[in-house]
Structure formats: C-alpha cells, structure tokens
Amino acid sequence: MWALAFVLAKIGIFAGVIAGAGGVLALGGYHNGSRAAHTRLLSYSLLGAFIGFHSSLAPVLIQAGQINDAGVMGMFDSDLVLLLRGTPVWESAAFRGAGFALSALLTLSLLRTLRAQRKPPDSVFYRLAFIGQALALGLVAYGFTLSGHVSVLDAWLRAALAFHVAAMAIWLGMLLPLRWCCDDVESGGLGELMRRFGRLGIGLVAALASSGVFMLLNLIDIIELFTTEYGRLILFKLGAFVGLLAIAALNKLRHVPVLHLPGGSRALARSIDRELVVAMALLLVTAVVTTLFGPATH
C-alpha cells in the first residue's frame, strides 16, 4: 500500500512539473496568439502546479503513515509529521512545494492580468512569466536532489539530476501545447512553429542524454544493466526514450515537411498523440524505478 502511494505521489510530481513548465514556456509563440490560447496554456500550467504542490506534500504524510503503522489515519498524526522536519523527505517536499506554490501564484497573477487587459500581452507579461517559471522550475528540480540515492552523492551528480529534471519538464511539457497547435494554427504557421521547436528540442535532448549518461555511469556498473532488476528497468526506460526520439525524428523529417498538404496537420497530430503515450509510459517507469529501486552499489 505505502509503496504504491509513494509511486503515485512521484507520478503526480512529474505530471505537475511537466505541465507547470510546459504551459508557461509555450506562451513563447507556441499558440495561435488568441486570448483563449493564452488562457488554456496558463490553465494547463496552473493545473500542473496544483497537482504538483499536493503531490509534493504527500510523501511526508505517507512517510508518517508508514512509520505510524495505523493505516490512512496515521498519515495525519501531526506530532509525527513534525518529527520528520529536517529529514530528506521533508526538505525535498519543502523545496518542491515552494516551487509549485510559486508557479501557482505566477499563473494566477498572469491569468488575472490577461483578463484585465483588452490589448494583447506586452513583453513585460512574457518576461515575468518566463523568469518566474524558471525560478519555480529551479526550486522543484533542486528538490529532487535532496532525497533518494542521489542525495548522498557529490554535487556534480546532484546538479546533473536537477539539469535532467528541468530538461525533461520542458521537453515533455511542450508536447500537449504542440498537439493543440495542430488544431488551432494554420499549416504555414504550424510548420514554422514545429521547425522552431525542433531546434529547441535538439538542445533539450542533448541536455537529457548527457546528464542521463553522466548519472548512469556514476551510479551503476554496465553489467548491472543486465543482471539486476534496477538495471533492466533502466534499460526499459532507455528504450522508451529512444522511442520518443524516433517519433520526434519522424515528425521532423516526415510530417512537418508535408504540413501544407491535405491531412498533413492531422497526421502530425496523430504522431504527437503516440509521442504522448510513450512519454506517459516513460514517466511511469521512471516513477517506479526512482521510488522502489536503487543501484546495488549505492
């Protein structure tokens, strides 16, 4: 029961950071420019912040319930919860929760500003959105380095994990806004938008791959990829990542060049739908492997 609860909380944190980052960053031109599109992106980000905030606090309550051994009601033993102050699970929850709270306050402020203005948002609106979300994402990413087996390792590995989380959140968080663009943006503008994301995606994939390989080489011996449960799950995760790259390459090389043809945008939309399914599988495996398993040497 408690293991499943921890996994579900981790999935909620992943979903929150992905939606929170993707919704705000997609304001940078990945929409049709309408007020409705701005509202939808900010609502997407706000939903992510809401889910992420509550999922970030959940591990503290789950830990208390696990220690108390009194069922679900044991999670709400305030004295025991307060005794967890200063532990890795508490500190991680504090930074993640602060990041998601900042993201929620930011998006609420942006939504209020958007509704109060009759004219399109100016550069200050976008600058505030991007800077605020970058700070929020930094807090959440740092929170990941404070718990788990990486938390006891050197600063370079913890920095690589934070970098990995941030790149993952941006890349996967942009997929749903891109899917919306297939329905809302005319084919000429959609092609330019997708080419621009393709250039951004190269940098994000490079960041994900380099940080992931660095952590992998420092956390596990290569032979353990084939001889341990943790290693085999890592291989499955790598396979899902390669699958995402294959779909992204297919989008770039096959679907984007023919967007001007009849049915071009629908074909791209279906491809992004498949990408979203693979991304969900990747996140599920990541939640399981980072919550329930660990490298044998750490």
Where are these regions (language model features)?
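Polytopic transmembrane helical bundles with strong interfacial aromatic enrichment
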Residues: 1-298
